Amino acid sequence: MRFTRIDWANVMFSDESRFHIDSSDGRARVYRHPGERYSDACVVQRTRFGGGSVMVWGGITCHDRTPLYVIQGNLTAVRYRDEILRPFVLPLIQAPGRNVTFQHDNARPHVARVVNEFLAHNNVHTLPWPAVSPDLSPIEHVWDEMQRRLRRQANQPTTLPQLSQALVQIWNDIPQATLSHYIHSMRRRCRECIQANGGHTSY
């Protein structure tokens, strides 16, 4: 498959990712005066067992993005169809004047029969995707960027609702030019993957 820069610009890349509360190494530096060891201002409350996690889904193109969807519970094929593909993917792909190819990986909910039938029924063209190849997808860089922005926040989320709200805000704040830059790297990604015979690349 020989995709040009324009071809890649007409692909919607999508994926799920999981973010954790208290995902740092757990160390916090506190500056205090003598005798203030147990002062409320000098005590950092820890979340046990990592504090839980939030799974999200998102899709990006060179021109726009879907809303970031927070997934509650386990994502089944039926939920993927009804909660993600129908409300978020179809409206963007089927918008007038658009000719968008849809990309998702080979996770079990993505390749289930009910999903394949739904995509075929709605004339959604999907991009064939090799197994176990996250370094090929530009949306992986979006997740990395979101993690960096999350860690830089002065007030770190301590509950799952706070984490969900922070992730949605971060997703919305990423400039579209950044998303386009990641997608425009696809030709280089594929070239490096071929040169590495399918092995690891710099991405």
Cite the ranges covered by each PLM segment.
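Surface/interface recognition patches
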Residues: 1-203
